[in-house]
Swiss-Prot record:
InterPro entries: Ribosomal_uL4 (IPR002136), Ribosomal_uL4-like (IPR013005), Ribosomal_uL4_dom_sf (IPR023574). GO terms for molecular function: rRNA binding; structural constituent of ribosome. One of the primary rRNA binding proteins, this protein initially binds near the 5'-end of the 23S rRNA. It is important during the early stages of 50S assembly. It makes multiple contacts with different domains of the 23S rRNA in the assembled 50S subunit and ribosome. Forms part of the polypeptide exit tunnel. It comes from the Bacteria. The gene is rplD. The keyword Cell division does not apply. Part of the 50S ribosomal subunit. This is Large ribosomal subunit protein uL4. It comes from Tropheryma whipplei (strain Twist). Belongs to the universal ribosomal protein uL4 family. It holds the Pfam family Ribosomal_L4. Gene3D superfamilies: 3.40.1370.10. GO terms for cellular component: ribonucleoprotein complex; ribosome.
Length: 248
């Protein structure tokens, strides 16, 4: 049986329990996969704008500092050589992209594994809503009564401004939209708190839309793929327009 989550109201009172969707909250976590996805996500955070100047880019003359022979010094052909003061850097960092290629299936499986870990430990919770008006005091009361950790991840819908304004200034609490839920944020938080609306959007009507491209609009669908008949009609239309232009 898949884990369950306690449902709270804004006052911190338990109003029921909800059986979590099995393939999202009761999967088989793959630690190596989770590590790979989190490392890729952290790498994507890097700006990659680091830059040093080579001997061809530093300012100043590249003249020969002293004659080739007779000084007792090692021969040197430029004042901008790497060993000279003011010289260029050898093999220094240059701007680059740190993004790792991470297939969507890996991202989905890693997130399901992280949520499974939290759900089995009883650290996935659901709140009906954060009320009709934003209130930091009500949010703090909810967290204290329910015993939620100070390292808390709140998952809400993108349109839920009440939740955002209620928790945005509380230390240790991070709020993400349901479409932004990711393995890294789940792992760095001890507890995960879904609003009921966000949970319904995340799992979808039958638990199949959890990782759709537009989780805040689960009713949207991709354009219908063209059928062979459609392709044939389009070809005939193009041919007809060509004949009209050529006068055939």
């Amino acid at each position: 049986m898949s884990p369950s989550a306690t449902v709270f109201d804004i006052g911190g009172n338990a109003v029921g329990t909800l059986q979590l969707v099995g393939h999202l909250f009761d999967s088989d976590p793959n630690l190596h996969l989770i590590h790979q996805v989190v490392v890729a996500q952290q790498a994507a955070f890097r700006q990659g704008t680091h830059k040093t100047k080579s001997r061809a880019e530093v300012s100043g003359s590249g003249r020969k500092p002293f004659r080739q022979k007779g000084t007792g010094n090692a021969r040197c052909g430029s004042t901008r050589a790497p060993q000279m003061r003011g010289g260029g850097v050898v093999h220094g960092p240059v701007p680059r992209n740190y993004v790792h290629r991470t297939p969507k299936k890996m991202i989905k499986a890693a997130l399901a594994g992280c949520l499974t870990n939290r759900a089995r430990a009883g650290r996935v919770h659901i709140v009906d809503s954060f009320g009709d008006t934003p209130s930091v005091a009500d949010a703090l009361t909810l967290f204290q009564i329910t015993g939620l950790s100070s390292k808390l991840l709140v998952v809400a819908q993108a349109s839920d401004s009440v939740a955002y304004r209620s928790v945005r200034n509380i230390p240790g609490v991070r709020l993400v939209h349901v479409g932004q839920l990711n393995s890294y944020d789940v792992l760095r938080s001890d507890d995960v708190l879904f609003t009921r609306g966000a949970y319904n959007v995340f799992v979808g009507p039958s638990g199949d839309l959890a990782f759709s491209e537009d989780r805040d609009n689960p009713g949207t669908s991709l354009p219908k793929s063209p059928t062979p008949e459609d392709s044939s009609d389009a070809t005939k239309a193009r041919s007809s327009r060509h004949d009209d232009r050529t006068g055939a």
